[in-house]
C-alpha cells in the first residue's frame, strides 16, 4: 500500500449545513427539521444555536422578482452599475485573477443593478451542479403531475431506499426519528429510507453526494415511468441493466437540461454531466460539467422570477436552499449574521507533492476550486451573487468568507 498518493482529488460540496425553514417538517416530512426545532427549544440534546437570519418561517420566504420584474434578464447588453462595478473592482484588486463573479442588487426589483468580473469564465461546478439536479427533479414532477397537490403527495409519500448509487460518499447527513434523544450525523447507508423531500434536503443542505446521485436517478425514473413512478425494484433494476449505456446517458442529461433550457438557461454555460458518486457514474456514464458565474446568476434570477419550472417549484427550491444552522464559507461572514442567506457552495481540491507545503482541504496546490452562490436578504437590501475561484494554496473557505463581508458592506453603502 502506498503511504502517499502522487495526488489527491477530493470532491467536497460542503461541510455540514442545513436548509429549509424549521416549521416545514409537518408538510414535507423532513424529520431532521423536527429534531433541530427540538434542539432550539432545549428539548433534546444538541448545542446548535441558529443565527438570527436563519429563523424565518416558511411564509416569510417569497420570490422578489415574480410579478415585479418578470422580463428582466442578464446578458452582454446589461449595463454595469457604476457604483457597484467600481466597488467590485476595488474588492478584487490585488486578488488572484482566477476570481470571477456576477452580482445583482434587486433591492428595488424594478431597477436591478448589475456588476461583474469575468462572468463568462467556466470552471468545474462541483456541488453547484446540484442546482441542476433539483431543477431536473422538479421539472420531471411538473411534467408528470401538473397538479401541485399531486406533486406534494409524490414528494412526501414516495419512500426511496438507498442503494448502490450512494457509493462512495464520506459526508454525513442528519438522522432523526420521533422519540430520539438527539440528532445523529452519519453517512447514508444501504437500506436507509427517506422520502423525496428528505433526499432533496440531504442533497442541498448537507450537500450529500450520495443524495445527489439518488435524486438524479429519481428524475430519470420519473421521466421514464411517468405516472407509473415509482417503479418496482425489479423494474428499476431491469431498466438500468438492459437499456444501452448511451441511452441512459442521454436520458440523464435530458432529465436535467429539459427544465433548465425551458427556463432560458444556456446549457453551453451551465451543465452537470457526471453523477456525484463512483457507482452511479459506472451505471450511467457521464460527460463534461461546467459553469460560469454569469449563468449561475441567471439561474438565481429565474428562480426569483418563478421560472425555474414554475412559481411553486421555484419557491420550494428557494426554501430548500435556506441556510438554517451555524454557517460556513461565504455564508459564515459575521457581516451576514442577521441576514437571511439562501446558499449553495461547491469545492474541489487537488494535491501534489511539494516540499515544505502541507496540502489539504480548501488549500489545494494543484487545484483549489471554491464556488459560492447566494441570495442575501439583509435589512432592506436583497442581492444575488455567484462567485467562482481557483486560488492555489490559499484557504479558500476563509477567502470567500472575507469577500462576502466586503460585498455586504458595498451593497449596504450604496446610495439610495
Where are these regions (language model features)?
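Surface-exposed patches in mature extracellular/periplasmic domains of secreted proteins
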Residues: 98-104, 145-162, 211-217, 226-228, ...
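Active-site SXXK
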Residues: 125-152, 160, 296, 385
Amino acid at each position: 500500500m502506498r503511504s502517499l498518493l502522487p495526488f489527491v482529488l477530493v470532491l467536497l460540496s460542503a461541510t455540514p449545513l442545513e436548509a429549509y425553514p424549521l416549521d416545514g417538517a409537518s408538510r414535507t416530512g423532513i424529520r431532521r427539521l423536527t429534531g433541530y426545532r427540538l434542539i432550539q427549544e432545549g428539548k433534546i440534546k444538541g448545542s446548535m444555536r441558529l443565527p438570527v437570519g436563519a429563523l424565518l418561517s416558511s411564509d416569510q420566504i417569497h420570490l422578489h422578482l415574480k410579478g415585479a420584474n418578470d422580463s428582466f434578464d442578464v446578458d452582454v447588453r446589461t449595463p454595469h452599475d457604476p457604483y457597484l462595478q467600481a466597488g467590485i473592482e476595488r474588492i478584487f484588486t490585488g486578488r488572484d485573477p482566477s476570481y470571477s463573479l456576477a452580482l445583482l442588487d434587486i433591492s428595488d426589483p424594478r431597477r436591478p443593478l448589475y456588476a461583474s468580473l469575468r462572468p463568462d469564465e467556466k470552471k468545474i461546478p462541483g456541488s453547484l451542479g446540484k442546482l441542476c439536479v433539483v431543477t431536473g427533479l422538479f421539472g420531471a414532477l411538473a411534467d408528470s403531475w401538473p397538479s401541485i397537490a399531486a406533486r406534494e403527495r409524490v414528494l412526501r409519500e414516495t419512500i426511496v431506499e438507498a442503494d448502490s448509487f450512494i457509493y462512495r460518499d464520506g459526508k454525513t447527513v442528519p438522522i432523526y426519528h420521533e422519540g430520539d434523544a438527539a440528532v445523529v450525523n452519519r453517512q447514508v447507508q444501504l437500506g436507509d429510507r427517506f422520502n423525496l423531500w428528505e433526499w432533496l434536503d440531504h442533497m442541498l443542505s448537507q450537500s450529500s453526494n450520495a443524495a445527489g446521485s439518488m435524486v438524479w436517478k429519481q428524475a430519470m425514473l420519473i421521466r421514464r415511468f411517468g405516472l407509473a413512478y415509482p417503479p418496482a425494484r425489479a423494474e428499476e433494476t431491469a431498466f438500468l441493466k438492459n437499456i444501452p449505456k448511451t441511452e441512459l446517458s442521454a436520458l440523464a442529461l435530458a432529465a436535467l437540461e429539459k427544465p433548465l433550457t425551458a427556463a432560458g438557461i444556456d446549457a453551453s454555460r451551465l451543465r452537470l454531466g457526471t453523477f456525484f458518486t463512483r457507482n452511479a457514474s459506472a451505471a450511467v456514464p457521464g460527460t463534461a460539467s461546467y459553469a460560469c458565474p454569469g449563468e449561475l446568476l441567471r439561474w438565481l434570477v429565474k428562480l426569483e422570477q418563478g421560472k425555474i419550472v414554475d412559481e411553486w417549484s421555484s419557491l420550494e427550491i428557494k426554501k430548500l436552499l435556506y441556510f438554517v444552522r451555524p454557517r460556513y464559507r461565504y455564508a459564515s461572514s459575521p457581516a451576514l449574521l442577521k441576514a437571511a442567506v439562501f446558499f449553495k457552495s461547491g469545492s474541489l481540491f487537488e494535491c501534489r507533492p511539494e516540499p515544505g507545503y502541507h496540502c489539504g482541504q480548501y488549500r489545494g496546490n494543484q487545484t483549489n476550486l471554491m464556488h459560492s452562490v447566494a441570495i442575501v436578504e439583509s435589512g432592506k437590501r436583497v442581492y444575488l451573487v455567484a462567485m467562482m475561484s481557483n486560488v492555489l494554496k490559499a484557504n479558500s473557505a476563509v477567502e470567500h468568507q472575507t469577500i462576502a463581508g466586503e460585498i455586504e458592506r458595498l451593497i449596504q453603502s450604496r446610495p439610495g
